[in-house]
C-alpha cells in the first residue's frame, strides 16, 4: 500500500476514535447521551441513572453502532418508556465538562456551543462558546436540600467561572502538553486528565472512574490561545501562542502568593510559541516550538487585601528555613523541562520603603542555598535585573537588553524543531494512548531525558505504537530539542514579566523562522513588522493573563511607548487599569477565589460542615509580619478569604519528590553566613574604581563559556549588554555617576536592614548572577513629557510619575 493511501486510511480510523458531537435525550428514569465521530461512522451510547437523589450512576454501552442501529435503539427506548412520557430530546452538545455535587443532587456540565480557535498539525482547537448545567436526578426524586439557599448559592458561585472566556480544548490533540512532549516517546503514567493544566480534572473524576476511556469528556485548558497567519518573503506560515495556567495553587492576586508546601507557586503559567510553515494542503511540513514559564517567587510570602491601602505590605514567613518548598518547586521544573533552569528575576533593587527588596534578597538566599547542593551543570542560573528602574532611564532600550538576556538563555536551552512526515499530519497525528503521558505526580512532562544518540542531527524519533508497521510510518526528523527552560518573575508575574517574555519570544521567533528555512538570519529587528505582529499577540496574552489573576488588563507602558502612543494617553490608561485592579482585588477577588476552589474541587461542601463563605482567610495566617511595626493597624482592612490549599482536600496524585538535576539535592544542615548590619560599606573611591572597570570592553555574553559563569557565579552587563566579572555583590547596590539611584535617601543599608528580621540560619551572602546596565537617570522625564501632560491635574501627574506608582 502506498504511503498516501495508508495516511488516508489512518485518518479515517483516527476520526472514528474521537466522539465530537453529542445529542442528549431524557426519560423519567434516565439520561441518554448519543455520541458520534467526525466521519459519522461510529455511534456510541452513554446512560445516566436519574432515580438517585444524591448519586449519579453512569453506564457505557460498549457497542459501536451505525447510524441506523443507533436510531433503532432510541426508538425502542422511547417505546419502552411511553407510559411515563417517552424519550425526549434535551439538547445538542459537544462534550461533557464534568459532574459536580454540592449538598443535594449531582449536576452535569456540558458544552452546547463551540468556536474554532485554530489548528495544530491538522488538529482543531476549540474554545467554549456556551455551556449548560443540567440537574441529573428527576424532579420527582429531589429532596428539599436541592432547593435550599445554600445549594442555590453554591450553584451561582460555580456559574461565576465563565467557561466561555479563555478555556480551550481539542478532541484529537493533547493541548495540555507541549508539542515536544506530544512528539516524544511515550512513558507509562496517569491519564492526561491529571495534567497540572487540565482544569476539569476534578469534575471528570467520576465519569473517568466509570468508563473505559475519555471519549465522552473534553480536557479543558485555561489560559490563552491565539493563532495567526503571517508571511515573510512571500512564504506563508502560522504562529501560535499558547499559555496554560496551572490548576495547582490557582487563584487571584492577593489571595494566592508565593509557594505552598508542595512547591507549587501562584500564577504558574507555561507559554508555548509554535511556528510551522503552511504547505499546500494546509498542514505543516516543518514545525518548531519554544516553551517558557512564569510563576510567583517561590517563597512563603503574602499580602493582606486592603480597601484602604492600594499597595499592601509584603509579609515574608520564616516557616521554611531550609527552603524545602522552593527546592520542591525547582525539582518539579527540572522534571518537566530538564536543565538548565534559568531564573530571570525582574523585581526592584531599591525602594524608599523595603517591599520587593525583601523578597529579592531572600530569593537570592534561597537560590544560593539550593545551588550548594547541586553540581555545576545542574545549578540554577539566576539573572537579577531591575526592569522598573531601567525602564525609567533616558536612552535605555529595555527590549534590546532583554533580548540579549534571551539570547543567553536560548543558547543554553535551544528550541524544538522537527520535520513531520505526511503520516503525522491531520487527525492521524496523535495516535497515542491517553494514559501514557503523565508523571506519577500528575504533572505533565515536556522533557524526555535524551539518549546518547539524541544529540545527533537528523535524529529519527518514533511514536510509541503497538504496530511495527505504524512505527515505520510515524517517523519524524528531530534536529533540535529544547532542554531546560527560562523562568521569569516579577512581583505579580504580569506586567514586567510579560515584557520580558515578549523579548524572549522575539529572539526565539527569529531562530524558529531560520530553522524552518523561512529567513536567512536568526535575528529579527525590533522595527521589523514581524516584531510588531508578535508584540501585539504578546500584549493580548498579557492582558488576558492579567485579567485572570490581577483583575485588570496588563500595564503595557513599554509596548505603548514602542508604538509611539501619546504619553499622556498611556499614563491615563495605566492609571485607570491600576484603579480597576485595585477594585477587583479589594471587592471581587474573595468570591472569585471561592468559585475557583469549588470548580477545582479544593473545597467540597458538606451538610455538617461550615459553608465556604463562613470560612476565613485563604492565605498563610501565620506569616511573619516583617513590616507590621511600620504600618498602622488602621491601614489594613481584613477581607474574608477562602481556604488555602494546605487545608483543602488533597488532590488525587501526591507530589513526587525528585532531584533538580542528575545528582539531586544534598541536605545542608550547617549554618551559612550572610549579610548583616556589619557588612562593609563600599566607599566612593571603590565605587569609582568599579565604574571605571566597566568601561573596558569585555567579551560579549554569548562568547563567555558556561564554566566561567558557574565558576564566578555572578555576571553583569554594561549598557551595551556586554559581560564583565563582578564577584559576589549586586551591581544594583553600587551608587555611581553611571548607576544612579532612584531615591538618593535610599542607600545600600536599606537593603541590609531588611535582613534584620530574617533568622540567622537563612542569612546567606548573596552570590548571585546580576545583570545591570549603566546609563543616566530620568525619573521625572524631560521637558517634552511635562508639556504633554500639562492638561492633567498636578496631583494625578505626581502620583503617576512617582517611583512607587503601580504600573510596574
Swiss-Prot record:
Subcellular location: Vacuole membrane
This protein's UniProt keywords: Hydrolase, Membrane, Vacuole
Cofactor(s) required for function per UniProt: Mg(2+)
Highest taxon listed in the record's lineage: Eukaryota
Enzyme class: hydrolase
A GO term for molecular function: phosphatidylinositol-3,5-bisphosphate 5-phosphatase activity
Membrane as UniProt keyword: yes
Keyword Glycoprotein (UniProt): no
Example of a GO cellular component annotation carried by this entry: vacuolar membrane
Residue ranges annotated for the SAC domain, each copy included: 158-551
Enzyme Commission number(s) from the entry: 3.1.3.-
GO biological processes: phosphatidylinositol dephosphorylation
InterPro entries from the UniProt entry: Fig4-like, SAC_dom
Catalytic activity: a 1,2-diacyl-sn-glycero-3-phospho-(1D-myo-inositol-3,5-bisphosphate) + H2O = a 1,2-diacyl-sn-glycero-3-phospho-(1D-myo-inositol-3-phosphate) + phosphate
Membrane topology: Peripheral membrane protein
Ranges of biased composition (kind: Basic and acidic residues): 465-476
Motif (Phosphatase catalytic core): 487-498
PROSITE patterns for this protein: SAC
Tissue: Ubiquitous with a higher level of expression in young seedlings than in other tissues.
Residues covered by region (Disordered): 429-476
Function: The PI(3,5)P2 regulatory complex regulates both the synthesis and turnover of phosphatidylinositol 3,5-bisphosphate (PtdIns(3,5)P2).
Quaternary structure, from the entry: Component of the PI(3,5)P2 regulatory complex at least composed of ATG18, SAC/FIG4, FAB1 and VAC14.
Annotated domain remarks: The phosphatase catalytic core motif (or RXNCXDCLDRTN motif) from the SAC domain is found in metal-independent protein phosphatases and inositol polyphosphate phosphatases.
Annotated protein name in UniProt: Phosphoinositide phosphatase SAC2
Organism, scientific name: Arabidopsis thaliana
Amino acid at each position: 500500500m502506498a504511503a498516501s493511501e495508508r495516511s488516508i486510511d489512518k485518518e479515517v480510523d483516527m476520526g472514528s476514535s474521537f466522539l465530537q458531537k453529542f445529542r442528549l435525550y431524557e426519560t423519567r428514569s434516565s439520561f441518554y447521551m448519543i455520541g458520534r465521530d467526525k466521519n459519522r461512522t461510529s455511534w456510541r451510547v452513554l446512560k445516566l441513572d436519574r432515580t438517585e437523589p444524591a448519586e449519579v450512576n453512569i453506564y457505557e454501552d460498549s457497542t459501536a453502532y451505525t447510524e441506523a442501529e443507533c436510531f433503532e435503539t432510541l426508538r425502542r427506548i422511547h417505546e419502552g418508556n411511553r407510559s411515563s412520557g417517552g424519550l425526549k430530546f434535551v439538547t445538542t452538545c459537544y462534550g461533557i465538562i464534568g459532574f459536580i455535587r454540592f449538598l443535594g443532587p449531582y449536576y452535569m456540565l456540558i458544552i452546547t456551543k463551540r468556536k474554532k480557535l485554530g489548528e495544530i498539525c491538522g488538529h482543531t482547537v476549540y474554545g467554549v462558546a456556551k455551556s449548560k448545567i443540567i440537574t441529573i436526578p428527576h424532579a420527582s426524586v429531589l429532596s428539599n436540600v436541592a432547593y435550599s439557599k445554600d445549594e442555590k448559592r453554591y450553584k451561582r458561585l460555580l456559574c461565576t467561572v465563565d467557561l466561555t472566556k479563555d478555556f480551550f480544548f481539542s478532541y484529537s490533540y493533547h493541548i495540555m502538553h507541549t508539542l515536544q512532549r506530544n512528539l516524544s516517546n511515550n512513558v507509562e503514567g496517569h491519564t492526561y486528565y491529571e495534567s497540572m493544566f487540565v482544569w476539569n480534572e476534578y469534575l471528570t473524576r467520576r465519569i473517568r472512574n466509570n468508563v473505559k476511556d475519555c471519549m465522552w469528556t473534553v480536557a479543558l485548558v485555561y489560559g490563552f490561545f491565539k493563532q495567526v497567519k503571517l508571511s515573510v518573503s512571500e512564504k506563508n506560515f502560522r504562529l501560535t501562542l499558547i499559555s496554560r495556567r496551572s490548576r495547582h495553587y490557582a487563584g487571584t492576586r492577593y489571595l494566592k502568593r508565593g509557594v505552598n508546601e508542595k512547591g507549587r507557586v501562584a500564577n504558574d503559567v507555561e507559554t508555548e510559541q509554535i511556528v510551522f510553515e503552511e504547505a499546500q494542503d494546509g498542514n505543516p511540513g516543518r514545525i518548531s516550538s519554544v516553551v517558557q514559564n512564569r510563576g510567583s517567587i517561590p517563597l512563603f510570602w503574602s499580602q493582606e487585601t486592603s480597601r484602604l491601602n492600594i499597595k499592601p505590605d509584603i509579609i515574608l514567613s520564616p516557616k521554611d528555613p531550609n527552603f524545602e518548598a522552593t527546592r520542591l518547586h525547582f525539582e518539579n521544573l527540572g522534571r518537566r523541562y530538564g536543565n538548565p533552569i534559568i531564573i530571570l528575576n525582574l523585581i526592584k533593587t531599591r525602594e524608599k520603603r523595603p517591599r520587593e527588596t525583601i523578597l529579592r534578597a531572600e530569593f537570592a538566599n534561597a537560590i544560593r542555598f539550593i545551588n550548594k547542593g547541586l553540581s555545576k551543570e545542574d545549578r540554577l542560573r539566576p539573572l537579577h535585573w531591575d526592569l522598573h528602574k531601567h525602564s525609567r532611564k533616558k536612552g535605555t532600550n529595555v527590549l534590546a537588553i532583554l533580548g540579549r538576556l534571551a539570547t543567553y538563555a536560548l543558547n543554553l536551552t535551544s528550541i524544538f524543531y522537527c520535520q513531520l512526515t505526511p503520516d503525522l499530519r491531520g487527525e492521524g497525528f496523535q495516535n497515542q494512548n491517553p494514559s501514557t503521558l503523565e508523571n506519577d505526580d500528575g504533572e505533565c512532562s515536556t522533557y524526555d531525558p535524551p539518549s546518547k544518540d539524541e544529540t545527533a542531527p537528523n535524529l529519527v524519533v518514533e511514536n510509541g505504537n503497538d504496530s511495527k508497521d505504524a512505527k515505520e510510518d510515524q517517523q519524524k526528523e528531530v534536529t533540535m530539542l529544547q532542554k531546560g527552560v527560562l523562568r521569569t518573575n516579577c512581583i505579580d508575574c504580569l506586567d514586567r514579566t510579560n515584557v520580558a517574555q515578549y523579548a524572549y519570544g522575539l529572539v526565539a521567533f527569529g531562530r524558529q523562522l531560520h530553522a524552518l528555512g523561512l529567513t536567512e538570519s536568526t535575528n529579527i529587528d525590533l522595527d521589523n513588522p514581524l516584531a510588531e505582529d508578535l508584540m501585539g499577540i504578546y500584549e493580548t496574552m498579557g492582558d488576558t493573563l492579567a485579567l485572570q489573576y490581577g483583575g485588570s488588563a496588563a500595564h503595557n507602558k513599554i509596548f505603548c511607548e514602542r508604538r509611539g502612543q501619546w504619553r499622556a494617553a498611556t499614563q491615563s490608561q495605566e492609571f485607570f487599569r491600576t484603579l480597576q485592579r485595585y477594585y477587583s482585588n479589594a471587592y471581587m477577588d474573595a468570591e472569585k477565589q471561592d468559585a475557583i476552589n469549588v470548580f477545582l474541587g479544593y473545597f467540597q461542601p458538606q451538610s455538617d460542615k461550615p459553608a465556604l463563605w463562613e470560612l476565613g482567610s485563604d492565605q498563610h495566617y501565620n506569616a511573619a509580619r516583617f513590616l507590621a511595626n511600620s504600618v498602622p493597624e488602621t491601614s489594613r482592612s481584613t477581607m474574608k478569604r477562602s481556604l488555602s490549599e494546605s487545608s483543602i482536600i488533597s488532590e488525587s496524585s501526591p507530589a513526587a519528590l525528585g532531584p533538580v538535576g542528575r545528582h539531586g539535592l544534598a541536605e545542608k544542615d550547617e549554618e551559612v553566613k550572610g549579610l548583616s548590619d556589619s557588612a562593609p560599606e563600599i566607599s566612593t573611591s571603590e565605587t569609582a574604581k568599579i565604574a571605571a572597570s566597566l568601561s573596558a570592553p569585555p567579551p560579549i555574553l554569548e562568547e563567555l563559556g558556561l564554566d566561567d559563569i558557574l565558576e564566578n557565579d555572578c555576571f553583569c552587563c554594561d549598557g551595551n549588554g556586554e559581560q564583565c566579572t563582578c564577584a559576589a555583590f549586586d551591581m544594583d547596590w553600587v551608587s555611581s555617576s553611571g548607576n544612579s539611584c532612584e531615591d538618593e535617601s535610599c542607600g545600600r543599608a536599606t537593603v541590609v536592614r531588611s535582613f534584620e528580621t530574617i533568622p540567622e540560619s537563612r542569612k546567606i551572602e548573596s552570590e548571585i548572577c546580576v545583570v545591570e546596565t549603566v546609563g543616566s537617570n530620568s525619573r521625572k522625564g524631560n521637558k517634552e513629557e511635562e508639556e504633554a501632560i500639562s492638561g492633567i491635574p498636578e496631583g494625578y501627574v505626581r502620583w503617576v510619575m512617582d517611583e512607587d506608582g503601580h504600573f510596574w
